[in-house]
Amino acid sequence: MDSLQKQELRRPKIHGAVQVSPYQPPTLASLQRLLWVRRTATLTHINEVWPNLFLGDAYAARDKGRLIQLGITHVVNVAAGKFQVDTGAKFYRGTPLEYYGIEADDNPFFDLSVHFLPVARYIRDALNIPRSRVLVHCAMGVSRSATIVLAFLMIFENMTLVDAIQTVQAHRDICPNSGFLRQLQVLDNRLRRETGRL
């Protein structure tokens, strides 16, 4: 054995402690940059953004035949109401589709956060039924419905806000308004605190 190998045997190998940096919540500007810079997905009427979870627009929601063909079993309308996307349980009568509606405005001052947990639970419960598929939609499928899908991924799939955005954007371009992004930031911070990652 040469002297170099002997020295290596005698000298203990010191490995530096791995530094795990705490989670840094994203700023509104960095989220908006992420939403605009990473645009790669094509925008169609309906896209599967997570296993058995679809994000779409009003056109997709009104095409009952296509929904049935895709195996959609549950529809979440985040633009419900007479002057928005006026579907509803009555619209889907005679089909196997279950309906959940939220009357939400695509307005930065609208508090969509009050719906995060109830709708996320509805989506989770629906996805736990074998062979279920869920469509979450609004008028364009980029702001209100995208915000709800992001909240679901954060709450029940344990994703950070950035991870959730990147996951969805790999399949569909989205652009939640600034008020919804702020509400998602609050959710992100709360979830990170509750899990001890902040």
Curated annotation (Swiss-Prot):
Q: Which reaction does it catalyse?
A: O-phospho-L-tyrosyl-[protein] + H2O = L-tyrosyl-[protein] + phosphate; O-phospho-L-seryl-[protein] + H2O = L-seryl-[protein] + phosphate; O-phospho-L-threonyl-[protein] + H2O = L-threonyl-[protein] + phosphate
- Report domain Tyrosine-protein phosphatase positions: 45-193
Cite the PROSITE patterns for this sequence.
TYR_PHOSPHATASE_1 (PS00383), TYR_PHOSPHATASE_2 (PS50056), TYR_PHOSPHATASE_DUAL (PS50054)
Describe tissue expression. Most abundantly expressed in the testis.
Annotated catalytic residues: C138 (phosphocysteine intermediate)
User: Where along the sequence do coiled-coil regions lie?
Assistant: none
EC number annotated for this UniProt entry? 3.1.3.16, 3.1.3.48
Sorted UniProt keywords: Hydrolase, Protein phosphatase
Tell me yes or no: is Transmembrane helix among this UniProt entry's keywords.
no
For this protein, the record's SUPFAM superfamilies field holds: (Phosphotyrosine protein) phosphatases II
- Respond yes or no to whether keyword Hydrolase is given for this record: yes
Q: Which GO terms describe its molecular function?
A: protein serine/threonine phosphatase activity; protein tyrosine phosphatase activity; protein tyrosine/serine/threonine phosphatase activity
Question: SMART domains in the record, alphabetically?
Answer: DSPc
Function as written in the Swiss-Prot or TrEMBL entry: Dual specificity phosphatase that dephosphorylates MAPK8/JNK and MAPK14/p38, but not MAPK1/ERK2, in vitro. Exhibits intrinsic phosphatase activity towards both phospho-seryl/threonyl and -tyrosyl residues, with similar specific activities in vitro.
PANTHER family in the record: AGAP008228-PA, DUAL SPECIFICITY PROTEIN PHOSPHATASE 13 ISOFORM B
Q: What protein family does this chain belong to?
A: Belongs to the protein-tyrosine phosphatase family. Non-receptor class dual specificity subfamily.
| Listed name of the protein | Dual specificity protein phosphatase 13B
Species per Swiss-Prot/TrEMBL record: Mus musculus
